Amino acid sequence: MSMTSPSPVTGGMVDGSVLVRMATKPPVIGLITVLFLLVIGACVYCCIRVFLAARLWRATPLGRATVAYQVLRTLGPQAGSHAPPTVGIATQEPYRTIYMPD
């Protein structure tokens, strides 16, 4: 036994089950969308966690620059000096260019 009611637009009879399906469709679509976004968000979160835990970020150009900056900061003030490098620490012999014959 089907419930029918007059349609306000056409004046004809509309089946009640169609109205019920149409009324429940937007919330179901919204629920599916929210669940889909949660799953995508969880996947992105897990990928970022693995990326950071495996230290893969160091392989990127920004990661290499970051590591180089950290190393330079740990070296202290001697890293920025412009003094020529020395060959022997005890003798303080200055660095000399060695020319190779052709």
UniProtKB/Swiss-Prot annotation:
It is a single-pass membrane protein. It comes from the Viruses. GO terms for cellular component: host cell membrane; membrane; viral envelope. The chain crosses the membrane at residues 28-48. It is found in: Host membrane. Keywords: Host membrane, Membrane, Transmembrane, Transmembrane helix. This is Protein ORF28.
